[in-house]
Amino acid sequence: MQDVLGNPAGVSSAETWGSWSEKADLGLNIVIVDDQMSARTMLRHVIEDIAPELKVYDFGDPLDALSWCEAGRVDLLLLDYRMPGMDGLEFARRLRRLPSHRDIPIILITIVGDEPIRQAALEAGVIDFLVKPIRPRELRARCSNLLQLRQQSESVKQRALSLEQRLLASMNEVEERERETLSRLARAIEYRDGGTSAFLERMSHVAGLVAEQLGLSEEEVRIIEMAAPLHDMGKIAIPDSVLLKPGKLTEDEMNVMKRHPRIGYELLSGSQNRFIQVGALIALRHHERYDGSGYPDGLVGEAIPLEARIVAVADVFDALLSARPYKEAWTMDAALAYLYAQRGRLFDPRCVDALLRGRAQLEQICGQFSTASARPGV
């Protein structure tokens, strides 16, 4: 025997819902769209009998239903094909255009023999069909199955999102370790050259500021900031008698000093790490000059990699602000005036202009990473 809704005698609709519902979050929304009130009432009655926790919303006007769906969450949609104003196929097409509703299960209610309509419905995104006259037991079974699949799909999405977040956190941790390693390596070279970590931090952030003002992507700015401190890596192979000499270098000593870009490149090249790859390029080219007067290869203009042109400006700006045994620290105004005077000669005009546009941020950077031997004074 069966009850009036088609359940076997003694078996409730809640029991036919399936054991999965015992552990599932039943905050699911079912939307019914049918212009006939009697049909909506019957559908609502059957669906609410599946489980009392389900929330059912019914609409006689397809446009009202579509407006509600645009703003609300939908887990299952029952849709009549023949409705005035907008048929079920057009409704399905419009719903599928909404990014958050592209995978909602849709059941289309049709009449027997509507095979062309079925084909068009599948193309419009309909998942399943109910044929009039609707049998309550079949309606419950189809809704239960699709809701179960919907719940499982959402669970998989949440798990994937959680795994993605954990992976991103792990990648960030690895990147932070790489950043620290590169920073300490660069600081070792800077200490040997008589500088401090504040100089490196300042130069790195100035390079990032120039890159940002040039309109580079956030990722490109980050890579340049991390790679910039590696620019003088080759100085590790320069003798102290040359590197630490307080006076002017002789021609022979200058030739020795000019080896450090290639040495730095050789030390850093061949890495699979993106930051070190860019660092190798910067190490090799940061002493090239826009007019071709630089070294090691006398490259001209945009033949010099953009990363190196950016770091060339940041490096000289930082060097001018830094006190050394052979010179006093310059003020920020004097340093910027020098860079402007050399735009188009030693430096890429776009990079100099980018630094000048970021004057406010530049003052903040210099204030944050100022030292006793550097005067950012304006």
Curated annotation (Swiss-Prot):
Pfam families: HD_5, Response_reg
Domain topic, free-text comment: Contains a C-terminal HD-GYP (modified HD) domain, which is involved in degradation of cyclic di-GMP. The GYP motif is required for interaction with GGDEF domain-containing proteins.
Catalytic activity annotation: 3',3'-c-di-GMP + 2 H2O = 2 GMP + 2 H(+)
Protein name: Cyclic di-GMP phosphodiesterase response regulator RpfG
Signal sequence, renumbered to the chain: none
Top EC class, one word: hydrolase
GO cellular component, one term: cytoplasm
Keyword Hydrolase among record annotations: yes
Residues spanning the membrane: none
Organism, scientific name: Xanthomonas campestris pv. campestris (strain 8004)
Function of the protein: Member of the two-component regulatory system RpfG/RpfC, which is involved in the perception and response to the diffusible signaling factor (DSF), which is essential for cell-cell signaling. Detection of DSF leads to the positive regulation of biofilm dispersal and the production of virulence factors. Activated RpfG degrades cyclic di-GMP to GMP, leading to the activation of Clp, a global transcriptional regulator that regulates a large set of genes in DSF pathway. May also directly control genes involved in biofilm dispersal.
Keyword annotations from UniProtKB, A to Z: c-di-GMP, Cytoplasm, Hydrolase, Phosphoprotein, Transducer, Two-component regulatory system, Virulence
Domain Response regulatory residues, every copy: 29-147
UniProt domain HD-GYP: residue ranges: 174-371
Positions where 4-aspartylphosphate occurs in the chain: D80
Coiled coil ranges: none
GO molecular function, one term: phosphoric diester hydrolase activity
Mutagenesis or variant effect for G294A: Decreases interaction with GGDEF domain
Entry PTM: Phosphorylated and activated by RpfC.
Subcellular location: Cytoplasm
Enzyme Commission number, as recorded: 3.1.4.-
Effect of Y295A: Decreases interaction with GGDEF domain
